[in-house]
Structures are given as C-alpha cells and as structure tokens.
Design a protein with these regions (language model features):
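Conserved AMP-binding/adenylate-forming
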Residues: 1-79, 88-91, 104-110
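Short glycine/proline-enriched turns and hinge-like loops at secondary-structure junctions
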Residues: 29-33, 86, 132-133, 179
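AMP-binding/adenylate-forming catalytic core of the ANL superfamily
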Residues: 41, 46-47, 71-161, 187
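Conserved beta-strand termini and adjacent loop/short-helix elements that scaffold enzyme active sites
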Residues: 21-23, 124-126, 169
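Flexible lysine-rich "adenylation lid" loop at the C-terminal edge of ANL adenylation domains
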Residues: 26, 157, 169-189
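Generic structural signal for well-ordered beta-strand positions
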Residues: 28-30, 77, 83, 175, ...
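Generic structural signal for residues in well-ordered beta-strands
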Residues: 18, 120-123, 165-166
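Regulatory helix in c-di-GMP signaling enzymes, encompassing the GGDEF I-site helix
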Residues: 152, 166, 178
Length: 193
C-alpha cells in the first residue's frame, strides 16, 4: 500500500475525518468526485469566540458530528488520499456552472506566453445580469488581445472559461507578503469594467 501520491496532500491523520460534499446541499459525494472539503475531529474548533454568526458560516452539524467547512474544493480517492483542486472563494458561477479562476489562469497563460507575454495574470469575476457572473483577466503588461483570443479559439478552449474582458492594469494588487490581494483585485476589475 502506498504512503503518498503525487498531487495529493495525503491521507487524513488518525482521528481526523474528511468528507467531500456538494457545496450547496452538503450531501456526501462519491469517491473521486470533486466538491467541498469538510473536516471533523478533536482539532476542529468549537467556534469563534463571541461570534456565533461567523461560527455558523464555517461549522455544520451532520450525522451528530461537527464539521469544519474548509472552503476548499477537493476530492478523495479510493485509498482515502485527499487532492485539493481550488478554493471555492476563487470560483465564478457562470450560467449555473462553477468555474475555477485558477483553471482560467492556467488556460490563458500559454496563449499569452505564445505572444511573448511575461507579466502577471490574475482571473476574477464580476456580476453579470445575464449569466450571474462573467470572467475578467487582469494583466500588468501590454499584450495582443486579438492574438490571445484567436489562440484560445484555435485551441478549442471551453467557451465558458474564456474571459469576456482583458484589462491591462498598472499593477496587480498584492498583500504585504507579495501574494495577490484577491478582494482588491475583484474590486479593481469591477471598477474598470
């Protein structure tokens, strides 16, 4: 029996339970199906101090067990290995479909690199009256938008994952540690669209 698998974060520690559930209904999903990661065990907090509202956002009771709602999208394989796919906070809902913003970035990066683009790429979503949300990509260098769109069409990229707007910005918003500031990035995109 293997003790690790490439791409997996491993198996839960002894005494820890992990479930993959539908993010809206919290119904448990089958092996290898992607969904919300729930964690239970003695290490899970009882709640936020003096903040029942915040506690109710991240803790649910199911089958007599308190589960922490991680916000991560993942899957469990047949051997109990957990693979994390993305964060649900980094997802967009377009016409009822959940789209990973990280996957959008991975999709457009080769198209941009093919055009000689070496800058940062950050995908986000903004509200859309027709589809619920629409995809926006922020970039911090000049690029040939038509060439990138043509590349994605030729590659037969899923049309749902193709950004509707490409916006060049002076700089991508970042936190003090250098990581992308996703809330500021989303706000900036909404202001510029």
């Amino acid at each position: 029996k293997t003790s690790n698998k490439i791409g997996s974060v491993g198996q839960p520690l002894a005494g820890t339970s992990v479930r993959i559930v539908d993010p809206e209904t919290y119904e448990e999903l089958e092996t290898n199906e992607q969904g919300m990661v729930l964690v239970a065990g003695p290490q899970v907090m009882a709640g936020y101090l003096n903040n029942a509202e915040k506690s109710a956002e991240v803790l649910i009771e199911k089958d007599g067990i308190t589960w922490y709602v991680s916000g991560d999208k993942g899957k469990l394989d047949e051997d109990g290995f957990l693979t994390l796919i993305d964060r649900y906070s980094r997802m967009a809902k377009l016409g009822g479909e959940m789209i990973s913003l990280g996957a959008v970035e991975q999709l457009v990066r080769p198209a941009l690199i093919d055009q000689g683009y070496l800058g940062d790429i950050v995908a986000t979503s903004v509200e859309d009256k027709r589809k619920g949300e629409r995809l926006i990509v922020l970039l911090d260098e000049a690029f040939d938008q038509k060439a990138v769109i043509d590349y994605l069409k030729k590659a037969k990229a899923n049309s749902l994952m193709r950004p509707s707007s490409w916006i060049q910005v002076e700089e991508i918003p970042r936190l003090g540690a250098g990581k992308v500031d996703f809330p500021r990035e989303k706000k900036l995109a909404a202001e510029l669209v």
